[in-house]
Structures are given as C-alpha cells and as structure tokens.
Amino acid sequence: MADTQYYGTGRRKSSTARVFLRAGSGNIVVNKRPLDEFFGRETARMIVRQPLELVEMTEKFDLYVTVAGGGISGQAGAIRHGITRALMEFDETLRPSLRKAGFVTRDARKVERKKVGLHKARKRPQFSKR
C-alpha cells in the first residue's frame, strides 16, 4: 500500500459503493470479483466504465470497489458515481467534463413509498361511477 490511492463514495437508489483508484493497467474488481463476472448485463458494465472512457483513462488505473445494497442498476450507478468522485480527487481539472456528462450529480431519485388506500405509490383502486 505504498502507492497512492484515491477514494470516492458513490450512491444511487439504496446502493452505496466505495471506490479505490490506484495506478495500474485497467483491472476493475467489484466485491473481490472481476467486473465481467460481477455484472452479467453489458449495460451495467458500460455504465461503470463511462467516467473512465470519458476522461480516456481506462488503461491507467486499477479499481477496487466494494458495493452494498440495492440491485444491479442501482449498484452500477453507485459505482459510476464513486469512480467520478475518485477521479476528481485525482485531478480536479476533470470536474467540468464529468459535470457536463452528468456524472458528478448524485441521482436523488428514490422509490416512492406506498400510501394507505392506494394499491401502489400512486395507483388508485378502480373508480366506479355507479
């Protein structure tokens, strides 16, 4: 652990990701498993790689990620947010390009709670006129 590492916490829905960025060759390890093994869906893998591809540093860093909570989509979004924060800690000049792509902003959308008297959060029971 002599080499420097950069850290970023990412959140999305109910998922939280801790991302450690170290100089390396582009290996991404999520919960002690390779990225391709952890995420079965290609879209999730693509979401995770987006910030690195934007700043053209895919082969420059090794990433060690721990992620907990939520599902596949939320975890992928949380990892992307964490990578973005770690990249900004590494080099603050990357912030404008990452902000323009929309990776810096925490996606605040959460599942809306179910209300009493309704079937779901907003779905009402069928209305009968007579």
UniProtKB/Swiss-Prot annotation:
Organism, scientific name: Pseudoalteromonas atlantica (strain T6c / ATCC BAA-1087)
Cellular component per GO, a single term: cytosolic small ribosomal subunit
PANTHER family recorded: RIBOSOMAL PROTEIN S9 (PTHR21569), SMALL RIBOSOMAL SUBUNIT PROTEIN US9M (PTHR21569:SF1)
Protein encoded by which gene: rpsI
Stated family: Belongs to the universal ribosomal protein uS9 family.
Keywords attached to this entry: Ribonucleoprotein, Ribosomal protein
Name used for this protein in its record: Small ribosomal subunit protein uS9
GO molecular function: RNA binding; structural constituent of ribosome
BP-aspect Gene Ontology terms: translation
NCBIfam families: PRK00132.1
UniProt-listed InterPro entries: Ribosomal_Su5_D2-typ_SF, Ribosomal_uS9, Ribosomal_uS9_bac/plastid, Ribosomal_uS9_CS, Ribsml_uS5_D2-typ_fold_subgr
Organism superkingdom: Bacteria
Ribonucleoprotein found in the keyword field: yes
Keyword 4Fe-4S: no
